[in-house]
Amino acid sequence: MQDLPVTLQLGLIGDNIAASRSPLLHKIAGEQNGMDVSYLRLVPREMEQDFDGVFQYAKDNGYRGINVTYPYKEYVTKFLEVEDPLVRGIGACNTVIFGEGMPKGHNTDYSGFMSAYRNVRGNLAPGAVLMIGTGGVGRAIAFGLVGLGCKELRLVDRDMLKAEALAADVRKTAPDVKVVCGSNAEALADGAQGI
């Protein structure tokens, strides 16, 4: 195997990530693209630092980017420039790119959902959608649906406070989208074109 010419330093900040397969995934992806990738698990308590210290460490020590996972995806946003207004609406980032200026924040749950949808449905906007679950990934999917042109979103969750909070955030970011919340999926499914 020939020497790989580019070294790319990446990492994952989170708690309870010892079993993460991300280091291997990124190493293989790097090899497939002619890059030597180093991807380290950065666990604040193991590094005897808080999140702020670990984030600054990555920023100051040549990391090109980091992934951020539980419980830091919402907290990290205060350190980031988030260009996409829908990602700002989500209120959580799981990918950070370091470069000139402020670190840039992204949410790959959101962008990945939108990409997968477009691969299957093209530019066809979703109709009325019933979405069950309004947790972290549910928030990203809801804003992805808005980005795809959804005009009616029906949110179902056992935790109505969480569903109402998401509904309020969607309405604030996209006031033209009709958002309804409830706990009865069967009733809200009537007339829905997607679940």
Task: Tell me what each language-model feature is.
Residues 161-169:
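Short alpha-helix adjacent to the SAM-binding motif of class I
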Residues 3-122:
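Phosphate/diphosphate ligand-binding glycine-rich loop within oxidoreductases
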Residues 32-35, 149, 172-176:
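Short helix-capping segments at alpha-helix termini
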